[in-house]
């Protein structure tokens, strides 16, 4: 079993374990979930993204962790931390919180609950001085969550 990084009232945030990548790809690679993320991914594109996710854990000790519901172990998505990699900007190296949840988990407060846990880890365990989140124009779901988390729009 993969190590549980933190937990909330309803959720476990844990490291990626055996079989998670295939399960995640199968349930998350839908037109609705991927709408704001460039569209449905090929297996090759997903594998490259997974290697980046696992690399965050290796390089920084944090990543986008698997989010499971405590009561039944259902994989709901991921949420966690990475470092910004935007060469040529002053953002590179800053902490970023991010999330992706399966469609049936939307609107139930899971993303906010997981994001609060990840933010607590950013400042508590990992010593983040600041924290960023990004989305694209039009993604009102993510914008709304950022605002409910107390984040301020910068652009």
Give the ranges of each region predicted by the language model:
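Conserved acetyl-CoA-binding loop of GNAT-fold acetyltransferases
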Residues: 147-155
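GNAT-family acyltransferases
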Residues: 1-104, 116-121, 125, 130-134, ...
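Catalytic-loop Lys-Pro-X-Asn motif of eukaryotic-like protein kinases
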Residues: 137
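Conserved acetyl-CoA-binding loop-helix of GNAT-fold acetyltransferases
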Residues: 99, 107-121, 140-148
């Amino acid at each position: 079993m993969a190590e549980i990084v933190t937990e909330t009232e309803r959720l476990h945030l844990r490291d990626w374990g055996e079989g998670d990548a295939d399960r995640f790809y199968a349930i998350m690679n839908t037109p609705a979930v991927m709408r704001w993320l460039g569209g449905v991914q090929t297996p090759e594109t997903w594998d490259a993204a997974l290697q980046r996710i696992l690399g965050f854990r290796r390089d920084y000790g944090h990543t986008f962790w698997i989010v499971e519901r405590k009561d039944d172990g259902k994989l709901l998505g991921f949420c966690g931390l990475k470092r910004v990699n935007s060469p040529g900007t002053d953002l590179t190296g800053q902490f970023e919180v991010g999330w992706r949840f399966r469609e049936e988990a939307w609107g139930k407060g899971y993303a906010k609950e997981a994001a609060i846990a990840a933010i607590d880890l950013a400042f508590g365990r990992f010593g983040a001085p600041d924290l960023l989140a990004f989305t694209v124009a039009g993604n009102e779901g993510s914008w709304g969550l950022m605002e409910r988390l107390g984040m301020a729009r910068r652009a």
